[in-house]
UniProtKB/Swiss-Prot annotation:
It is found in: Cytoplasm. SUPFAM superfamilies: Nucleic acid-binding proteins. It comes from Shigella boydii serotype 18 (strain CDC 3083-94 / BS512). HAMAP family: RNase_II (MF_01036). GO terms for molecular function: exoribonuclease II activity; RNA binding. One of its GO terms (biological process) is mRNA catabolic process. This is Exoribonuclease 2. The keyword Hydrolase applies.
Amino acid sequence: MFQDNPLLAQLKQQLHSQTPRAEGVVKATEKGFGFLEVDAQKSYFIPPPQMKKVMHGDRIIAVIHSEKERESAEPEELVEPFLTRFVGKVQGKNDRLAIVPDHPLLKDAIPCRAARGLNHEFKEGDWAVAEMRRHPLKGDRSFYAELTQYITFGDDHFVPWWVTLARHNLEKEAPDGVATEMLDEGLVREDLTALDFVTIDSASTEDMDDALFAKALPDDKLQLIVAIADPTAWIAEGSKLDKAAKIRAFTNYLPGFNIPMLPRELSDDLCSLRANEVRPVLACRMTLSADGAIEDNIEFFAATIESKAKLVYDQVSDWLENTGDWQPESEAIAEQVRLLAQICQRRGEWRHNHALVFKDRPDYRFILGEKGEVLDIVAEPRRIANRIVEEAMIAANICAARVLRDKLGFGIYNVHMGFDPANADALAALLKTHGLHVDAEEVLTLDGFCKLRRELDAQPTGFLDSRIRRFQSFAEISTEPGPHFGLGLEAYATWTSPIRKYGDMINHRLLKAVIKGETATRPQDEITVQMAERRRLNRMAERDVGDWLYARFLKDKAGTDTRFAAEIVDISRGGMRVRLVDNGAIAFIPAPFLHAMRDELVCSQENGTVQIKGETVYKVTDVIDVTIAEVRMETRSIIARPVA
């Protein structure tokens, strides 16, 4: 009799509208209960039975109940699920399969089945890609997933690579395709095969994309020709190979191997500037004055060269530092190395005085065995030979940025605007507390930014530098010329790595249009979005594989007295993150390991300090000794403890 009663329906509607609700993100705990985090200040308790309806990370709307002064949340509506597509480990076999997502806070197995047409018989321990199909807040009885891709078996030594690439939906192999003949681009190529061009790379590098030639000029000037591999001589715009490169956007460099943007026949052979092989190049000829400034007579042109030597970073550095056994194979090559070192010094000084120079951080290299096991991790400091190449490339990219800006007004530019204007006052206030006075307006200009950076570099420690990093904006890829505050330059456009960066291929095509005096079409902004997204995914993949390998490498050190020097990189309420100086691994030190009495301990992310009883004991950038307390392989996390 009450079924269609309009009064009852109205009452229900009224009750519903009067019941308090909140939208937020579910945070799970290891104890079964959870919290609905509405914002940084407000969260509501979710009891264990209600947590069965949701998953960590779900964005939901919940009804808020108040009982005896205590508020709790009852999940009501799903706004956005945390899991859609994910990777995980399969449990069970045949008809009764479940998958445990590979995520530190998702421990529960989700019932699943293989998608139709997936011809793999899943078994315990297999890694798979899955997609969520059912959710309790969508009216389903339980969570349910569908296995859409088999990744590999549980004991595969290369799990870190295959699982990571599948997680980020990145390619596992080089693209297919061959380029059989060079295009007729209507370019006149200068024959520079007689010049003593050299390449300087790691011993294992196959995709050499830059060769250098230097010569002394009158009036203490130096000439530098930077010759860059020319894949756009083989790959037509809009062709199948071009489209594949556009999607990949970059070569993906992971520990142990890379997945190239172009087919290996091109990246490692046809386009690679191998010693004693004639190759087409796009080249830039520049004159450097005595103080290292690049003069205005910049010239871009097409050419053919023949590299006369494949030099190796460490050998060149040793020779310039008068150590080691290696000698250049001829006086002509020796003279090239000496001139290039001179150019490097001049350009380094010019950038130090007129732009900005990054502090040198070592590169960490994983040395892997046949089965992907980590034999060692070595820190490779940036030496003179690395700097020779770096200075030459930066100079060449400055030239391209100028030419594209002046001749076309567009290109693919790396733009970094320094500090976010919204943060300028807070930044000035923070610096003032440390005795540095800056004008909030001035610091938003390129000159003001450079001035501040130089003052920070002159500080005895990097502490203040680390405090202001959060006020900086991110570097972006733009079709519009703009400044690069991080480098201290008015404009910066890369073209020196076209084998491994699609944006550099675009700039090659634009520079060729300039050389031929033709009009060019402005690149579409969508391509910069794709490049930025791919760069983000590749970096995450590199980090994920690295975390896995670090965990493998340090597992046998857990619980031992082996000491590691570690730099504090971040402090949060829960503890400190540190980077092991010798190998680059990131480890976490939980707050209880810092001091047993929690009420005497203050870990402040805001100040970058840890205080015990009001005394600052640790701060970001401090280097301390730690031991490895535990390595959790399932989450690839390393827990460290300070040495007392």
